[in-house]
From Swiss-Prot:
Residues 262-271 have a biased composition (Pro residues). This is Protein CBFA2T1. It comes from Mus musculus. One of its GO terms (cellular component) is transcription repressor complex. GO terms for biological process: DNA-templated transcription; fat cell differentiation; negative regulation of DNA-templated transcription; negative regulation of fat cell differentiation; negative regulation of neuron projection development; regulation of DNA-templated transcription.
Length: 577
């Protein structure tokens, strides 16, 4: 009894209170350990929760620090020196157990979201224990992976207790003659084994982010829920989860305390509300749930400090309600999808039936039209046949009406009419394309013909000019040869022989004389025609024409002599041979 009377005069979670709890609390859920010195506050900034409350900075191993609104003195030191404080062996074991439960809960929470996120969380946890990640990096990467921010007490808790786990890992690795990374890779189940530790509810570690659509773990409410209510009714000083941040401000409860013993500051007016704060909107669940959160809180109010711990235990059931809300939203979404599928199926059925009805009506009127044509051609037999198929007697007036109906465009959905219009449109496009193609081809042919005509005229002019120039050049050469007595009359080179018939033409050899004989024989020997009738001219053997061309005397003189007539006989006689 002296312990109980002393508890009313001490601070919350004082060493005396913690010693009392250590005797009553089972090993699965240990209370916060005792502190060995003055309260130490961390440098962690208080963070406003989603329901509008704030957590004040936590101290080492659950010792209370003055809240932000009630502190009269400054804080002592930063959280960097928390890991250097010596702890008793029993307290260290409890802190290691809490830290392992915390890491196991994080890993299982990631697995509940998805296997990929669970694997990423496991990698982050191993990196944190292996000292490859700092606590701040672990906090940011975990929030990025799960999209859930951790509660403000987590970083000071890790800074205070992670060195204990790392020292234990280093000690075990030295005993196994391995480095810590190898030992942790081989004995990972000792750190993240859910069967050896009792994991806490993930809602105690993570802030409420209902609007981002993340799910909560639905399968751990009984571990921290009403299954332990008889135990807590017998021992109200026991705490169901020593690292739970589930305390939330309530207007009916006044000042509440964090699970590690730190009182909350006076909160601002709430801006966000939990689902339990709006219990009136969820009457559909009250019939099969336990007594409401507000009733149990009013019942436990006379208990003082421990009533807040009972409220903390009740807060664990919030995940069940949120899980029900998620299922409700999912069920509503599935119902909407089913309604859309059903409406789409009905619409398709109606369209198919309309199409079939239109096709049957079209076939019916086609048969009526064919029967009417047969009636005109075949007579009474066709008339009786059409009367059997048609409910209306095929009189001439009705036939005219049916014919007009057939030629009138149908107002409903007629596949044949649509197909006919599509074919006509395609044919029209083809005709236009062919017309354009023919125009393009004819234009190209016309341009090519004009180009060919122009080029041909240019070519003809060029050829005519070349011929004229060649003729002028030939005449100039001939005239130059006739004027010169020293050049060959055929090729223009230096002449060495003279024609024996006229002693005028000069040649460079017998070849040129034979070549020029066709032109030269018309004028050769005209001046010596009278004297040459009596005697045969003596022709040099070197310049005798070929037999095929005939002798100069055998060839009759031309009627028209060349423009340059040889000189007089006296001149010819005097010309040296």
């Amino acid at each position: 009894m002296p312990d109980r009377t002393e508890k009313h005069s001490t601070m919350p979670d004082s060493p005396v209170d913690v010693k009392t709890q250590s005797r009553l609390t089972p090993p699965a859920m240990p209370p916060p350990p005792t502190t060995q010195g003055a309260p130490r506050t961390s440098s962690f900034t208080p963070t406003t929760l989603t329901n509008g409350t704030s957590h004040s900075p936590t101290a080492l191993n659950g010792a209370p620090s003055p809240p932000n609104g009630f502190s009269n003195g400054p804080s002592s030191s930063s959280s960097s020196s928390l890991a250097n404080q010596q702890l008793p062996p029993a307290c260290g074991a409890r802190q290691l157990s809490k830290l392992k439960r915390f890491l196991t809960t994080l890993q299982q929470f990631g697995n509940d979201i998805s296997p990929e996120i669970g694997e990423r969380v496991r990698t982050l946890v191993l990196g944190l224990v292996n000292s490859t990640l700092t606590i701040e990096e672990f906090h940011s990467k975990l929030q990025e992976a799960t999209n859930f921010p951790l509660r403000p007490f987590v970083i000071p808790f890790l800074k205070a207790n992670l060195p204990l786990l790392q020292r234990e890992l280093l000690h075990c690795a030295r005993l196994a003659k391995q480095n810590p990374a190898q030992y942790l890779a081989q004995h990972e189940q000792l750190l993240l084994d859910a069967s050896t530790t009792s994991p806490v509810d993930s809602s105690e570690l993570l802030l409420d982010v209902n609007e981002n659509g993340k799910r909560r773990t639905p399968d751990r409410t009984k571990e921290n829920g009403f299954d332990r209510e008889p135990l807590h009714s017998e021992h109200p000083s026991k705490r169901p989860c020593t690292i739970s941040p589930g305390q939330r401000y309530s207007p009916n409860n006044g000042l509440s305390y964090q699970p590690n013993g730190l009182p909350h500051p006076t909160p601002p007016p709430p801006q966000h509300y939990r689902l339990d704060d709006m219990a009136i909107a969820h009457h559909y669940r009250d019939s099969y749930r336990h007594p409401s959160h507000r009733d149990l809180r009013d019942r436990n109010r006379p208990m003082g400090l421990h009533g807040t711990r009972q409220e903390e235990m009740i807060d664990h059931r919030l995940t069940d309600r949120e899980w029900a809300e998620e299922w409700k939203h999912l069920d509503h979404l599935l119902n909407c999808i089913m309604d859309m599928v059903e409406k789409t199926r009905r619409s398709l059925t109606v369209l198919r039936r309309c199409q079939e009805a239109d096709r049957e009506e079209l076939n019916y009127w086609i048969r009526r039209y064919s029967d009417a044509e047969d009636l005109k051609k075949g007579g009474s037999s066709s008339s009786s046949h059409s009367r059997q198929q048609s409910p209306v007697n095929p009189d001439p007036v009705a036939l005219d009406a049916h014919r007009e109906f057939l030629h009138r465009p149908a107002s409903g959905y007629v596949p044949e009419e649509i197909w006919k219009k599509a074919e006509e449109a395609v044919n029209e496009v083809k005709r236009q394309a062919m017309t354009e193609l023919q125009k393009a081809v004819s234009e190209a042919e016309r341009k090519a013909h004009d180009m060919i005509t122009t080029e041909r005229a240019k070519m003809e002019r060029t050829v005519a000019e070349a011929k004229r120039q060649a003729a002028e050049d030939a005449l100039a050469v001939i005239n130059q040869q006739e004027d010169s007595s020293e050049s060959c009359w055929n090729c223009g080179r230096k002449a060495s022989e003279t024609c024996s018939g006229c002693n005028t033409a000069r040649y460079c050899g017998s070849f040129c004389q034979h070549k020029d004989w066709e032109k030269h024989h018309h004028i050769c020997g005209q001046t010596l025609q009278a004297p040459q009738q009596g005697d045969t001219p003596a022709v040099s053997s070197s310049v005798t024409p070929s037999s095929g061309a005939g002798s100069p005397m055998d060839t009759p003189p031309a009627a028209t002599p060349r423009s340059t007539t040889p000189g007089t006989p006296s001149t010819i006689e005097t010309t040296p041979r």
